[in-house]
Amino acid sequence: VISRNFTVVPLRKQDKEDSRMRTLLIGLLTCLVLLGLDRPARADLDSYFRKPEPVYKWEKTGEKKVDGGTVIDLHLVSQTWQGGVWQHRLMIFRPDKAVRTDFCTLFNTGGGGSDGEITLGMTAAQITGMPFAILYNIPNQPLYGGKTEDSLIAYTWEKFMETGDESWPLHFPMAKAVLKAMDAIQAYTKEAGQTEIKGFVIAGASKRGWTTWLAGASKDPRIKGIVPMVIDTLNVTAQIPHQLAAYGKPSEKVQDYTSAGMQEKLMTPQGKRLLALEDPYSYRDRLTMPKLLVLGTNDRYWSQDALNLYWDDLKGPKWVLYNSNAGHGLEGLDTQLRVLNAVGAFARAVAGGNPLPKPTWKYGFRDNFSYLDVHSDIPIKSAKLWFAHSDTQDLRDAKWASAPMSPIDPANPTHGVFGSKGVPAQGYTAIYAELTYAQNGKAFSLTTQIELMAPKK
């Protein structure tokens, strides 16, 4: 519940023979509609995921012992998409000291992997206390004349709008590859005589975070939790005008979409159909599994408070972790460790370990001060109030600072904290709280939403 005593930035006749002929024509058209022959080939998310993939296969290409565990290398062929066979590197990191061996965190990413990422993968496995896997080459690229990343996604959206072929949107094969990676991991562990992997936490960043949402929407019972990172654009039809109100024009980071006229095209009937297929917000009633949203402040792709356009509509257990001054890349070793620790706590909780805290928060505004009260069912080890200010709604270049929060009740200091920040007479102030917890000697952080406010006029 949020007390809104302040101005919040708005997050928009003929003869018998002719009659018989007309009746026959109507009947024929009705049959065509029922048969689906009146429209282009359809491939909604469910049918795309169900489509058989005869090329699917995997093989083990390597195994080596490293400090802290074992790394297994697999080569995965996931599917055929638009005539091309998708291939991936799939690395599995098994820690020597595992809390659970029947659960796996699966991180999907781009690139082809490097030896330098072995340390990161094994560190993640040790922190989570269970196998950790990295699926590479999401998506397979470059394609169509060298297109990669956002230019490739924008191209596939245009192809959908031109053809009506619902298998074109790139996130579909990206998400299906994740499902096929789960198949491969389970098949490998069975063949190797290892403990069967029964549950997965799926994670990924940016467009791979979008992939994470859609994989979760598959209703695959193996997916027990999801961690979408730095993909703060659910409810796209509301996000577009919200960003324009904040920035005055689309972010420079979405130039590939702007150049293709996507902001306008997405408001057309074909564009709305695309979003019904692609926008994870369309699948929110399915996304009831536990979810941890990892975001960076100053992420230039999205409006700073974009989460507030969909957070309340997310079903099931949910948590958020903002990372101050971290941007879209979640830069900095401290940030990366904070993210790994939070993902570890989340994965352990989803796998049946200690449940995560359930913080609740309430914002208020009084006497030119913004207030934030936070309550927690589990003791809080420490709490910070993060704040930033800008003359406009554009906080992309704002510098975030923090101050300690104080107990609401000194007699019960670890279950409730508050913080306040003066709001200047001009401009906009954003605040959120970071809460640090400790479970079984492992520290991790969670945060509240960001609230962006201006003095009440």
Task: Report each predicted region and the residues it spans.
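N-terminal cap/lid segment of alpha/beta-hydrolase-fold proteins
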Residues: 51-98, 166, 171-172
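Short beta-strand element of the alpha/beta-hydrolase
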Residues: 89-92, 101-110
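Cap/lid segment of the alpha/beta-hydrolase catalytic domain
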Residues: 130-179, 233-253
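Gly/Ser-rich "nucleophile elbow"/oxyanion-hole loop immediately N-terminal to the catalytic nucleophile
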Residues: 161-206, 218, 223
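Mobile cap/lid helix-loop segments that gate and shape the active-site cleft of serine hydrolases
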Residues: 190, 237-283, 288-290, 294-303, ...
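Hydrolase active-site cap/lid region
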Residues: 214-264, 321-325, 330-337
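Serine-hydrolase catalytic core
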Residues: 270-326, 367, 373-381, 392
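Surface beta-strand/loop "capping" patches
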Residues: 345-387, 404-413
